[in-house]
Amino acid sequence: MKLGSDELMTRRAELPRVALKRPVSRMTMSAKMTLSALALAVCFAAGCGAARPSKYYQLTVPGDMAPAANPNPVPITLLIGRMTGSALYREDQIVYSSGGESMGTYEYHRWAEPPTEMIAEIMLRQLRASGHYRGVYSLRSDIHGDFLLHGRLYDFKEVSGSAEVARVTLELELRNVKTGNTVWTHFYSHDEPASAKDVSAIVAALDKNVQQGIAECRASLDEYFAAHPPAPPATQPAAAQPAPQP
């Protein structure tokens, strides 16, 4: 049976459309399965679920306490300036190294404040509480001081090796505000052994090391002023008494 030319052309035109329907359907299903697998892989790689919490640590900062009673304090006003350091120590990361040139930071263990700021605050509180000086204030205050104490933090980190240690290296400098001359310096460097190989033990060792270093610097500063006692402030001349009336 022969088909008319119009009918034959119509059937030929319909055949490709029918043949293409099934591959398109199979490709769509395959793409969906691939996308689902990729989404699961990304989810696992990103650590889907609750994020790991960060832990924060701080050094032991003395509380606001009344200065110790001292009938004869050194007659100066001491200003506590900035403690400078590398960018690592002006941020809140806890730094570690293996004793070589490379250093790293812990991702989920951080300081509550940058180490440079905590150490400056400890110096301020301890020197003020000692009662050894007429006054101890922060450089940020409006108080006029006689001497400025400031310094630089070189090391404040965990050092891994045969034993875990907490290394603190700093240098303090005392400057006469009036003359601008540096009159005293003190360098401190010490490796304090940690009781265990974990971050909490390293923090405890760093804290102990800092307290020991500041105590050593305080003793050296006291020795300087004992050997170079500043002149007491000049007393104001007494007001002239009025002449008696005749």
Residue positions per predicted region:
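Surface-exposed short loop/turn segments
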Residues: 50-74, 125, 130-181, 246
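Short secondary-structure boundary motifs at beta->alpha junctions and helix caps
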Residues: 102-110, 178-216
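Extracytoplasmic/secreted envelope proteins and their assembly/folding machinery
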Residues: 116, 120-124, 130, 207-214, ...
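Bacterial N-terminal signal peptides that target proteins for export
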Residues: 4, 9-36
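Generic short beta-strand segments
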Residues: 83, 152-156, 189-190
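C-terminal or internal capping secondary-structure element at the end of a domain, subdomain, or sheet
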Residues: 165-175, 185-189, 212-224
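A structural "domain/chain start" motif
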Residues: 48-116, 224-246
